[in-house]
Amino acid sequence: RDVLGSRGLGDVYKRQGISNVGIVAKSNFQSLMDHVGSGSAYDLSKRRSNLSILPPYDGKAFSSFVETIYNMHGYIEHCREEYVLISQGNVITNIDYTDVFDFHSKKKADITLIYKNHAIPQGYDRPITLDVDDDGKVNQIFVKPGVVDKEAFNHAYGSILIKKDLLMSEIRNAISVNQLDVKRLLQSSLGKYSIYAYENKGYCATISSINDYFEFNMDLMKKEVRDELFNPQRPIYTKVRDDAPSRYGLTSNVKNSIIAQGCVINGEVENCVISKGVYVGEGAKLSNCIVMQDTKIGCNTNLNYVIIDKDVTIKDGRSLMGYDSYPIYIAKKSVV
């Protein structure tokens, strides 16, 4: 859900990566633990770096941001770093946090919010939008009751840089008066603290619905998006699975798709994102699909605008067709 990254400002010049990361998990986090593991894939399993999974205490997901931070106080206060960087887990971007720390320090800000000027995703019922002056100072914080299509707003998407002591002080005060809404908490802080906003000018996608997830994956077909996200100056690390290279049969035909290793492709694939270990049978036609790992797609199938979760079996001859604004979702381990 949320990533709490913390480090001192002095460390920011040594490296881009944050060396102490806590991931706040929801109630079912087995897949998350399997993916991040010990943190070794992200260079976070060494003596001076750490990755922690922070599950809810009673097995239930936290109901609010304020409650989440309050219940993580033991982890946060145990960290030796002076600053905390909070980031939402549903935001896809590749941002240089060194620049954010430099901005925060230069402005002598108490709180820095990171925002993107764009049309707000439809899944946000009450997004936080900002009125920012030319110097980056936040004049007003709005909680928008609805979303206006095709209009650009300064959307604060949930990334916050703040001193650890200030964060915990405000969270305790909010809990004491039962103020659990982070939007209202930020609004009440505007008169007390110096709040600045840093604009993320790169690619930024927020995933709040199946449609958002589908649109983001389709964006990966665009070279400019891939170049932005997979910037060699800020490489993205992930869990490694040692698979053989993907094999393309004589009957295969692949266009404008991203295909991971370990796949066997014998059919036609166009505008698709296909994860590791996927099998596509002869005569199968896949268009505008997202197929997750270890899925088996039978012969002579016809799939269009379909999102398929892990370990799914699509039997021979099946046809499934969604639409760009309403893709079909097939749950994990289903048999169709």
Enumerate the language-model features and the residues they cover.
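Single conserved hydrophobic/aromatic residue that forms the stacking wall/gate
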Residues: 2-9, 13
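A structural motif
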Residues: 16-18, 269
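Short internal beta-strands
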Residues: 22-26, 114-115, 307
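Short phosphate-binding loop-to-helix
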Residues: 34, 41-80
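Active-site acidic Asp-centered loop
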Residues: 87-88
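Conserved core of the sugar-phosphate nucleotidyltransferase
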Residues: 94-165, 169
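Left-handed beta-helix
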Residues: 165, 173-336
